[in-house]
Design a protein with these regions (language model features):
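Conserved class I S-adenosyl-L-methionine
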Residues: 1-45, 47-54, 59, 63, 91, 146-173
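Class I SAM-dependent methyltransferase SAM/SAH-binding core
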Residues: 59-106
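A conserved beta-strand element that flanks and buttresses the S-adenosyl-L-methionine
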Residues: 119
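A short glycine-rich, Lys/Arg-flanked "PGG" loop and its adjoining helix->strand segment in the class I
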Residues: 131-146
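Acceptor-substrate binding/catalytic loop of class I
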Residues: 176-192
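A C-terminal cap/extension of S-adenosyl-L-methionine-dependent methyltransferases
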Residues: 206-257
């Protein structure tokens, strides 16, 4: 079986993904955090060529296209990319994007020039060989270029499940008895990811926690009713320890050396 067949494809459930992820407070907060990080990134201060690996429905890619960047979106799911293209037309940026239904493992075959900036968000945790994927990202970015990598944090998943009282699940080392279609099956230990990045030829220039507080609220209704204050707190503290390390996701800015 090929790697492309093994890795997760969201064809057939793109609409469910949009409703349950992108349109929720989780998705809104993630978008705001990433856009804040990018607004402070000198690599994106002027229009650039960007590759978005596992772009999904393109929420972040299209926001960058609106800032003047040329963005190539790739994803295993054609359904996701079709939604991205439709949204791009509505925003008037369809001439600034290209969409390709390709797995990460196929991108080296395209003979594209290396990109100054590569994004790979919430992808590694769906792959069977995440360490190999980081090496493949290094091959796609220019030396001296930037990779924005966001991954699902196993430490944070463990912490949240302890808080919820899911002790048996934690004692099974977060092994699912029944798989949940939109829940990543392979959360990653941050120390492993840091090591893989170094071995692949990257230096970590920045680290941000994503959803450092959102998932831990005692009153979950406040995720919606107090969203503005929650976001303000997130943006103020999500680069400081220990909070950065308990974000449900970690966002790393990697410099290719």
């Amino acid at each position: 079986m090929s790697k492309k067949q093994q890795d997760r494809n969201f064809d057939g459930i793109a609409g469910k993904f949009q409703k349950n992820i992108y349109q929720t407070t989780k998705g809104r907060l993630r978008q705001a955090v990433l856009l804040r990080d990018f607004a402070e990134c000198t690599d994106l201060a002027t229009p650039s060529r960007i590759l978005d690996v596992g772009a999904g429905q393109g929420q972040l890619a299209l926001a960058l296209a609106q800032q003047g960047h040329q963005v190539t979106l790739t994803d295993l799911s054609q359904d996701m990319l079709d939604m991205a293209l439709e949204d791009a037309k509505e925003r008037g940026v369809d001439t600034q994007i290209q969409c390709h239904a390709l797995a990460l493992q196929q991108l080296s075959e395209q003979q594209w020039p290396a990109f100054p900036v590569v994004l790979c968000h919430a992808v590694l945790e769906w792959l069977h060989e995440p360490a190999e994927a980081i090496k493949q990202l290094r091959a796609l970015v220019q030396t001296g270029g930037l990779v924005s990598l966001m991954f699902y944090n196993k430490d944070a998943k463990r912490l949240s499940n302890i808080i919820y009282g899911n002790f048996n699940y934690v004692l099974r080392d977060l092994a699912f008895k029944k798989k949940v279609s939109l829940s990543p099956q392979n959360p990653l230990q941050p120390e492993d990811v840091y090591r893989w990045c170094k071995e692949a030829g990257f230096v970590i220039e920045g680290k941000t926690g994503v959803r450092c507080f959102h998932d831990y609220l005692r009153d979950r209704s406040e995720q919606e009713t107090e969203f503005d204050k929650l976001l303000q707190v997130e943006l103020q503290y999500n680069r400081q320890e220990p909070y950065a390390s308990i974000g449900r996701y970690q966002h790393l800015l990697l410099r290719a050396i």
